[in-house]
Regions:
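Flexible internal linker/loop segments at domain or repeat junctions
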Residues: 265-307
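Generic helix N-cap/helix-start motif at coil->alpha-helix transitions
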Residues: 36-43, 74-78, 90-101, 111-114, ...
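C-terminal soluble interaction/assembly domains
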Residues: 297-378
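Alpha-helical repeat scaffolds
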Residues: 62-65, 91-104, 114-121, 146-157, ...
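Residue at a conserved register position within TPR or TPR-like alpha-solenoid repeats
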Residues: 50, 87, 106, 140, ...
Length: 378
């Protein structure tokens, strides 16, 4: 019996099992025109028949007999390959190949709790790789153990796939803190719009948000490329108009029109209104700025600076907002966030992060400032 013949036998055996890729695992060595000895050949044929009958114990006994009479390196190689085939076919978890086979069979059979338990066999056989760890995490999810999934995904390498699963399990487990942490990690790693969508949706659900906080979250959707469609453009524009930031609303609506998202009459009427209001604001800007400079408090300067950001004059806005911060403010946090927003719009990311990071309380303002800071790291 040649090595090539034996490889064909082994392939047939392995393809009859549920161990995906098992043939490739065992038959990695190249075929060659070698033969096994006369005493070993018949024993291997008997072992083949026993394996086909799934009598693995008897097949192993035959291989042990062959082991006792082997006389060539080819004998040893083929016997070892047969043993590997038995380990995989029988899903013997005490061998590397068998542990992998049992793991795959249990997952394919939907035995997700067994998959979780199989991880210990993979560890013992030193074959518990990153892909297997992700499969265990998926098994926790499919078994409905979402809290267990959260705990487990925190112990494995934090790949994008692991973090995505962690966020999903955290959502199912009502663990908003972990969900936020997972999305923040994903945003920091790649900044993909889908990750920003998840993170900003969480931010939007936070309690006690002011309209200004909500405006900022909508601004961040536009900035991070995570706008969902027409409603997001309209919402951002309407909030901007509410705060008299008409130039910003105009820019947002024009982007929606350019993207062919805003084509209806209502959107076009809103754009016309924004253009009209923006022109009026610009005409009065010098007068309003002089009055704000003369005022004892700095809130009007902060607002004018915020409007200037929307007009595309971020560098000018920085100085105006800084002057506002030198005076008493009703809302110091807003002033600090606006300074960071102006720096970011001007391309000064380090200064923007420093400004955002000064906002510590209350939680709603600190959360929004933190989101801005994450955007400044892009």
């Amino acid at each position: 019996m040649t090595s090539r013949d034996l490889r064909a036998v082994l392939t047939a055996i392995l393809l009859g099992t549920a161990a995906t890729g098992a043939a490739a695992l065992v038959l990695a060595a190249p075929a060659q025109a070698a033969t096994v000895s006369a005493k070993v050949g018949p024993l291997l044929k008997e072992a083949q028949a026993l394996i086909a009958a799934k009598n693995y114990k008897a097949a192993m006994a035959k291989l042990n007999e062959a082991e006792a009479v082997k006389s060539t390196p080819d004998d040893t190689a083929i016997i070892n390959q047969f043993k590997g085939a038995i380990a995989i076919s029988s899903a013997d978890p005490n061998t590397p190949g068998g542990a992998k086979a049992k793991f795959a069979q249990d997952y394919n059979a939907g035995k997700f709790k067994d998959v979780i338990a199989d991880a210990e066999y993979l560890r013992k056989n030193n074959v518990f790789d990153a892909q297997s760890q992700l499969i265990v995490a998926q098994a926790y999810f499919k078994a409905g153990d979402h809290a267990g999934c959260v705990r487990y995904t925190k112990t494995i390498p934090q790949s994008d796939t692991a973090l995505e699963l962690q966020a999903r399990c955290a959502y199912e487990a009502n663990d908003e803190a972990t969900q936020r942490q997972a999305y923040e990690a994903l945003v920091a790693r790649s900044g993909k719009p889908e990750y920003w969508k998840g993170l900003l949706k969480l931010g939007e659900r936070s309690r006690g948000l002011s309209d200004h906080n909500t405006l900022d979250i909508n601004r961040l959707r536009l900035l991070t490329g995570s706008m969902g469609g027409k409603d997001d453009y309209i919402a951002l524009a309407q909030f901007a108009i509410q705060f008299t930031f008409a130039a910003e609303a105009q820019a947002v609506l024009e982007k929606g029109v350019a993207a062919k998202v805003l084509t209806d009459d209502r959107s076009l009427r809103l754009l016309a209104r924004a253009k009209q209001d923006a022109a009026a604001n610009l005409a009065n800007e010098a007068k309003n700025l002089a009055a704000a400079n003369a005022a004892p408090q700095g809130d009007d300067l902060i607002k004018i600076g915020e409007n200037m950001i929307g007009e595309g004059k971020a560098k000018d806005a920085i100085g105006v907002i800084q002057n506002g911060l030198k005076k008493p403010l009703k809302d110091p946090n807003n002033g600090q966030i606006r300074l960071g927003q102006a720096y970011l719009a001007a391309g000064q990311k380090a200064e923007a992060q420093a400004a955002f990071n000064k906002v510590k309380t209350p939680e709603k303002d600190a959360m929004v400032a933190h989101l801005w800071s994450l955007a400044a790291r892009r």
